[in-house]
Amino acid sequence: RRALLIGSRLAVTGALLTLLARLDHRPDVLISGSAIGFYGIDDSSAIDEGVARGRGFAAELCARWEAEARRAEALGIRTVLLRTGLVLGNSGGMLASLLPIFEAGLGGPVGKGRQMMSWIHRDDLVRLIVAAAADGEFTGALNAAAPNPVSSRTFAMALGQALHRPAILPLPALPLRLMLGDLADELLLGGQKVLPVKAIFHGFRFRYPRIEQALDEIVGRTVKRAAISTRPFVEARLLH
């Protein structure tokens, strides 16, 4: 699994850089994916873009991925390394998997619930990518995370409130470690308190700076979509 994760990211980025080197007319900017896993597990202090690489597999993966992308700088291409937090949206990712569990009233914090979660609403992520592409002041590492990280417990409570469901059943650490091994600590049980210092410095304004705002919007959109999708069925039943 680890070899696949490293190989896929380095191979695709390397192939892209090889292609860019052959072009006579190159793009002005390359925005390369990365993740806040670069910083390792550390929720004891705030993390900005100047913090050094952490320890662990995720940190190694992100560092190697970023190093490959930085080859674009030698080609005269402005390079932005987007260190993305947990992306929240209603059409995929972790939240889409959690929604049915929380809707059934079976949700709760992961582990002890104290680990910090650095997150970003999907719409804000898209807007930040557009801003970074358009503004030449963006270069190097860029934390793509909302300015208000929360604990796993706070996240669970906010999601429960958005769904009008209880969120008091914790997901124990043991089964996660049995399923994922030591990756469980890096991906789910460990935390990071990442702040978007560069984005704010360059004038970017988040539409969803707080977890309650983000989850209320996402849940509302999900409910509206579900209502629209069931309307033809209801109307057909009424006609018969």
Q: Could you describe each region identified by the protein language model?
A:
Residues A63, L75-I77, L88-S97, A132-L142:
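Glycine/proline-rich active-site loop of Rossmann-fold NAD(P)-dependent oxidoreductases
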Residues R153-M157, M179-R205:
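Conserved C-terminal active-site "lid" loop/helix of NAD(P)H-dependent oxidoreductases
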Residues A52-A58, G85-S91, K112-R122:
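Glycine-rich "substrate-gating" loop/helix at the edge of Rossmann-like oxidoreductase active sites
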Residues R1-L30:
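NAD(P)-cofactor binding segment of oxidoreductase domains
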Residues G33-A59:
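Active-site "gating" loop of Rossmann-like NAD(P)-dependent oxidoreductase/epimerase domains
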